[in-house]
Structure formats: C-alpha cells, structure tokens
C-alpha cells in the first residue's frame, strides 16, 4: 500500500513539475504587467512575486495564501495564469453584479414581497 501511495504522489509531483512555463511576450513582458492587465486590483500583489516570471507559474494556492493574497484574488490570478499557460487571451474579467432580488432559489418569494410592498405604499 505504501508503494502505491508513493507512486501516485510521485506521479502528481512529476506532472506538476512538467507543466510548461510560457515565455514572456512583447504584450506581457513581466509579472507586474500581467497583474495590471488582468485587473481586479491584482497589481497590488506585484511585489509578492518579486517580478519573477517563474514565481508566477510555479506558485500555487497554498503558497499565495501564505503570502497573504485574499481568496477571490488568489483564485482569479491562478485562473488567469492557467489561461496564459494554455495560450488563451489575457484580459480582465469583470466581477458580476448581484441581482436586486438575490439568488435564484428565493426569487419568486422576494419578488412577491417587493410587489406587495409597492402596492401597499401606493
């Protein structure tokens, strides 16, 4: 059993180490430019990466957590890094705006209450 666990652990580490690190482009020459381009105030964390391209691609979620990056920005940065690694376009994805009536589950109830309040107010 120990051998099986060791084999799977080594395979996972080898897979993670073999992931390609793309070369900097003229559009995105360094880490600070990348973080500024993806938006959502991620450029605040540029000094954490020490402007090293390898740090951007080698650091994972726990490492960013250790450095003090908030959860939402951490997930967003890792998503954009993976998109760059796969050759996709790097652009800002704006945060969604929450609906006035809340989520899908209680929408009918909230709309009914709101309409009742509107009728009583008028």
Swiss-Prot record:
Indicate what this protein is called per its UniProt record.
Small ribosomal subunit protein mS41
> What does the UniProt function comment say about this protein?
Involved in telomere length regulation.
Q: Name one GO cellular component term.
A: ribosome
UniProt keywords (A-Z) are: Mitochondrion, Ribonucleoprotein, Ribosomal protein, Transit peptide
Q: Name one Pfam family in it.
A: SAM_Ribosomal_mS41
Name the species this protein comes from: Eremothecium gossypii (strain ATCC 10895 / CBS 109.51 / FGSC 9923 / NRRL Y-1056)
> In which compartments does the protein localize?
Mitochondrion
Family label:
Belongs to the mitochondrion-specific ribosomal protein mS41 family.
Quote the gene name from the UniProt entry: FYV4
Identify the InterPro entries for this entry: Ribosomal_mS41, SAM_Ribosomal_mS41
Residue range covered by the transit peptide: 1-10
